Each structure stands twice: as structure tokens, then as C-alpha cells.
Curated annotation (Swiss-Prot):
Pathway: Glycan biosynthesis; glycogen biosynthesis. Pfam families: Alpha-amylase, Alpha-amylase_C, CBM_48. GO terms for biological process: glycogen biosynthetic process. It comes from Bacillus cereus (strain ZK / E33L). The active site is at residues 301, 344. The keyword Transferase applies. This is 1,4-alpha-glucan branching enzyme GlgB.
């Protein structure tokens, strides 16, 4: 690296220069320490090796813009250290290394010398398989989890990365999730920030073990066909004294202007995304996790907070952030075109998942926060009043193809007094389970990839408690076992049913049969795959009423079978199912060529699959009928 390159040009391997590197110089083994502190008056390295005396190992300033460096011989791996920084005000402050790849276990805050290289990976088969598939036309089910509270040992201590590989991976495989999404694993001082208020961006948190232990965990995930997505927070960081905040006594990584520096809601500060050094720090960090940890994707947190300045009373876009996100995504996809870059964005910013060359931000997925908010508000409403907010369940289809969406039932909605998904459902005990089964049925049949927070799969009753583990004892109760069985059957059905994912991002993959039955709160629609015979009919009843001989318009197949009914007794339902083959009556209904008469279960979802291939019904011009949505697509990535 040229001396000025880090300050003026795109340099995405800054972790190779900065931090603590075990090297041999002048035939002496030791550690080369390099750090950026543009307004420091003097710098030194301190640790047990010099009894934390900042007068002993003074660093040399190697660029006018504030790069400092020093080689210290005879220091070995696992040595703890910090930088002692003399500020322009004459104070001496002690800081952890921004580029450290390992740190002490909290509450201690020193950095640790660690050789990040040397792990032998065994995931070449995983990499080859990924390249053969297009994620856009594949099933995608993401299990979101918090590493520290998924499961704990009997004595309350945390499972390590290696132990989690043994505990978590078989569970994820059993449930047929395609990916896990882990809440932030960068080093962070405060457990209850869940990792979102980090400061050690290059250090996998030592709460669970070493960086090599985390590599082992990812390697094992890949061995069993599970992708690993990490929550990543490039927008803001914590203000703890040992971290990035006021690193050299002045705003270094954060904005100088207090109006845009502070995040009063979170108690954090925003990265100055207009600085080349900060961009290089963050984009290098993303590539570092990709290269060293073989991560398969990032869920980029709080994109809305990045896109807009947080000045009170203003909604002005932050052009630094817009430019940064485009640069970030270009760098990531240049590194790995099969990577997942998901934006957690609640705004209406256009073209989030469009390529940068089309004027987009360059992500390939976006959380559909609007769908999540609308659907949960609808489900929390008393069933008899749902007819008055009917549009909350249909509105999402007006924009479902404007972006590549993931439907999130995430941690944000089951904490801070919002209740668990199960407990959001109104009514008595039976009603709650029936409606959660219904919600999941709608979730898995609506266009978009899927994400569920841990515990939802068996109907966690209490909201998420981040200092405890999940209520695994609920499996002792029959209704929770029924829920768990239902969820596993539903996800298995989803994965083997091409209509439910093959055209997720194309309007040809969805068609309303009846979106207007607000009086009965019944919705029916078709999901379509690439082939005409790959079609499913879905009927959802959001009230407790049961309907016999209910007419539903269907595509022109001769017979239909009900392949899933959430009211089946084996799932804890009342047993209002359609056991017999359903003959399609050749009379048009709901703008379809034929219809079937079925039993609609209470708080139930019924999924029908055609038995025989389409008979070849013709339009007047002689062409075959094609199932089609009336929504216009934005276009594929």
C-alpha cells in the first residue's frame, strides 16, 4: 500500500496493514502494530509485556494523515494490548485496536494478539453447489437467532461456537431451514445491546470462543448445507470509552457535527461515511468476514437511519450513506456474486434491490417491513373487526415486485412488550394456536423469501427474553408439540413446492382468486411455478366460522387434492378438512375457468394441488391460458 492510498483511494484490504500482525523483521519474530489516529499528538503500545507503561513503546507516525506503526520483537500470540494515545489536549487515553481480530472477554476490554490465518476449511463442495443455483428461484427459509439466548447450559453459562455447532446445526437441519441469520457477533461490551452496539468490528466476540472456533461453526453449517448470514451494523457504533468513539480525542470514525453524529434513541454515534478512511475500514471489514469466515450474507442493520440525516424535523437524504452503500455492494458482489446482501429498511426509498448501474442501492434483498407491520396489526385485531381493515392483507401485493423481498417475522416484533407471535393472537388458548397456524400458512404461501425468529417454530408463549434461553419445556405441552409438528410439515411442503418460491420475484407467480371478501375475511389466491402444471390454490379464513360447500374458483384442472389443512387434528385443529379428491366443476367462478366446493375450516388455511395436468383451455386467440398477476414487475436483478 502506498502511504497515501488508505486516505485517498479505495483500499479494501486495510486489515492486512492495520492491527496487530505476527511477523518476522530483521530476523526477529514479533508483532507489527499499525493504527490510524489522525489527531494524536503521540502514540504507544501498552500491555502486560511493558506493565502498561506508555513511555516504553512509542509508535512512529508514518503518514501526515495519521498512520502510526511500531514493531515490537518477542511478543507472542494471545498477548493483550491497547493503544495509549496522547491527545492534542494533553490527555492520555487507552483504546482497543479498531482492527483487532480478537479481544478479551467482557467486561475486560483489551485487544488480543491472534493469528487469524491457518484455519483449514472443508467447504469446497458448499461453494460449488452455491454457484450452480440462483437464490432468486430457490426456496429460502431463514432461522434468525441470538447466539446467547437460543439455548443455555443447565448452569446458565453460554454454549461456545463449537458447542453450538453440535446443538444448533442438527436442529436447523431437522427443520429444513436453508440459512441461519445470527444477530451481530462483532465484539461488543454490553450483552443487552444484542451486538448492535459494537466496537470491535474485526473481532468475533470472545464470549463464545476464538475466531477459529467460529470458523469451525460456519464450516460445519456448510457441511450440512446451511448458509450463514450475519447481522452487520455499518451505520453506527457504541460510545464506550475503550472503543472507536473519539478515538484520538477527536471525532475520528464518527461525524464531527453533533447534529448528525448522535443517535439519541440508541445512545450511539454514526459513522462518518463521507471519510475515505472510514469507508475503507467498513468495506474492508465486510470483505474480511467474507474471506476469513466464509460468511454467505449480511443483513445490513438500520439502513433507514443511514439513508436519512437524523436532524430533528428533517427528512433530508444522506448522500454520503447512499454513495457508501452503493460502493459497499459493488465491492461485495465483485468479491462474490452469489452473496446475500439484505437491507433492513423501513422507508420507501426506491430501487433498494436494483443494481447500482440502474441507479439502485445494489442490495439483492430487502426486508418487507410493511408486510410484517400490516399483517401483524391485522392478526392482533379481533376477528369480527378484521373486515374493516381487510386492505392490510392485500396491500402488500401492490408492491410485492417492486423489490426482491424477504418476509420477516423477526426479533423486533417479539420483544419490548410487543408479545410473542402466539400471544399476539386474540381469543382463547385454542384460538391463539389456530390463528398462529393460519398466520404461518399465509406467510409461507405469500410471495417472498421467509425469515422466522427463534422460538416461533414451536409457539414460544412469552416474548423473547434475551438474558434467558428459549422455553424448551413447552414441548411438554400437547398444543406446542402440535404447533411444532405443523411448522415442520409446512416448511417441508414449502421446500418441495416450486409454486411457492420459483417465481417469488415475478408477477407471473401470483394471482388473486378473491381478494375482496372482506365480510367473511376469506382470501384465496394462486401460486404458480415455471410450468403451467405447477400451481397451488390457497384459501385462508381469518375468522372462526366454518363454511361447508364453499365455492372457490380454480384453474382448469380436472381434480384437486388438499395437501395441507391447518385445522387437521394432528396439528391441534378441529378436523374440518377435505379428505376426498375434489372434482373441478366446469363452470367459471372468480374469473377462473372452473371451481371446487370445499369445507373452509375455522381460522384455517387450505392448500389445494391439481391432480392432473391442465386440459389446455384456450383463449379466443387459441393460446393457452396463463396464470398471471395484474401487478407490474420492477424487473429482475
Amino acid at each position: 500500500m502506498k502511504r497515501d492510498e488508505f486516505h485517498t483511494e479505495k483500499y479494501y484490504e486495510s486489515y492486512n496493514i492495520f492491527g496487530a500482525h505476527i511477523v518476522t523483521e530483521d530476523e526477529m519474530r514479533g508483532v507489527r502494530f499499525t493504527v490510524w489516529a489522525p489527531h494524536a499528538k503521540a502514540m504507544s503500545v501498552v500491555g502486560d509485556f511493558n506493565e502498561w507503561d506508555y513511555e516504553q513503546h512509542k509508535m512512529l507516525q508514518v503518514t501526515e494523515e495519521g498512520i502510526w506503526s511500531l514493531f515490537i520483537p518477542h511478543i507472542e500470540e494471545r498477548e493483550i494490548y491497547k493503544y495509549a494515545i496522547e491527545t492534542m489536549a494533553g490527555d492520555v487515553i487507552f483504546k482497543a485496536d479498531p482492527y483487532a481480530v480478537y479481544a478479551e472477554v467482557r467486561p475486560n476490554t483489551a485487544s488480543v494478539v491472534f493469528d487469524i490465518k491457518g484455519y483449514e476449511w472443508n467447504d469446497k463442495n458448499w461453494s460449488r453447489k452455491k454457484k450452480k443455483k440462483s437464490v432468486y428461484k430457490e426456496a429460502m427459509t431463514v432461522y434468525e437467532l441470538h447466539f446467547g439466548s437460543w439455548k443455555k447450559k443447565e448452569d446458565g453459562t453460554l454454549y461456545s461456537y463449537k458447542e453450538m455447532a453440535e446443538e444448533l446445526i442438527p436442529y436447523v437441519v431437522e427443520h429444513q431451514f436453508t440459512h441461519i441469520e445470527i444477530m451481530p457477533l462483532v465484539e461488543h461490551p454490553y450483552d443487552r445491546s444484542w451486538g448492535y452496539q459494537g466496537t470491535g468490528y474485526y473481532a468475533a466476540t470472545s464470549r463464545f470462543g476464538t475466531p477459529h472456533d467460529l470458523m469451525h461453526f460456519v464450516d460445519e453449517c456448510h457441511k450440512y448445507g446451511i448458509g450463514v448470514i450475519l447481522d452487520w451494523v455499518p451505520g453506527h457504533f457504541c460510545k464506550d470509552a475503550h472503543g472507536l468513539y473519539l478515538f484520538d480525542g477527536t471525532p475520528t470514525y464518527e461525524y464531527k457535527d453533533k447534529d448528525v453524529q448522535e443517535n439519541p434513541v440508541w445512545g450511539t454515534v454514526n459513522f462518518d461515511l463521507g471519510k475515505r478512511e472510514v469507508r475503507n475500514f467498513l468495506i474492508s471489514n465486510a470483505l474480511f468476514w467474507m474471506r476469513y469466515f466464509h460468511i454467505d450474507g449480511f443483513r445490513v442493520d438500520a439502513v433507514a437511519n443511514m439513508l436519512y440525516w437524523n436532524k430533528e424535523g428533517q427528512e433530508q437524504s444522506n448522500e454520503h450513506a447512499v454513495s457508501f452503500l452503493r460502493e459497499l455492494n459493488e465491492a461485495v458482489f465483485a468479491e462474490n456474486e452469489d452473496f446475500l446482501m439484505t437491507a433492513e429498511d423501513s422507508t420507501a426509498w426506491p430501487l433498494v434491490t436494483a443494481p447500482t448501474y440502474e441507479g439502485g442501492l445494489g442490495f439483492n434483498y430487502k426486508w418487507n417491513m410493511g408486510w410484517m407491520n400490516d399483517v401483524l396489526k391485522y392478526m392482533e385485531c379481533a376477528p369480527e373487526y378484521r373486515k374493516y381493515i381487510h386492505d392490510k392483507m392485500t396491500f402488500s401485493l401492490l408492491y410485492a415486485y417492486s423489490e426482491n423481498f424477504i418476509l420477516p417475522l423477526s426479533h423486533d416484533e417479539v420483544v419490548h412488550g410487543k408479545k410473542s407471535l402466539l400471544n399476539k393472537m386474540p381469543g382463547d388458548y385454542w384460538d391463539k394456536f389456530a390463528q398462529l397456524r393460519l398466520l404461518y400458512g399465509y406467510f409461507f404461501t405469500h410471495p417472498g423469501k421467509k425469515l422466522l425468529f427463534m422460538g416461533g417454530e414451536f409457539g414460544q408463549f412469552d416474548e423473547w427474553k434475551d438474558l434467558e434461553d428459549l422455553d424448551w419445556n413447552l414441548h411438554d405441552f400437547e398444543m406446542h408439540r402440535y404447533m411444532h409438528d405443523y411448522f415442520k410439515e409446512l416448511i417441508a411442503l414449502y421446500k418441495r413446492s416450486k409454486p411457492l418460491w420459483q417465481l417469488d420475484h415475478s408477477p407471473e407467480g401470483f394471482q388473486w382468486i378473491d381478494a375482496n371478501n372482506n365480510e367473511q375475511s376469506i382470501f384465496s389466491f394462486i401460486r404458480q411455478g415455471d410450468k403451467q402444471e405447477d400451481a397451488l390454490v390457497v384459501v385462508c379464513n381469518f375468522t372462526k366460522a366454518t363454511y361447508e360447500n364453499y365455492k372457490v374458483g380454480v384453474p382448469d384442472f380436472e381434480y384437486y387434492n388438499e395437501i395441507l389443512n391447518s385445522d387437521a387434528e394432528q396439528y391441534g385443529g378441529s378436523g374440518q378438512v377435505n379428505k376426498k379428491r375434489l372434482k373441478a366443476i366446469q363452470e367459471p367462478y372468480h374469473n377462473q375457468a372452473a371451481h371446487v366446493e370445499i369445507t373452509i375450516p375455522p381460522f384455517g388455511v387450505s392448500i389445494l394441488r391439481p391432480v392432473k395436468t391442465r386440459k389446455g383451455s384456450k383463449k379466443q386467440d387459441g393460446s393457452k391460458t396463463k396464470v398471471r398477476s395484474n401487478v407490474t414487475s420492477r424487473g429482475k436483478r
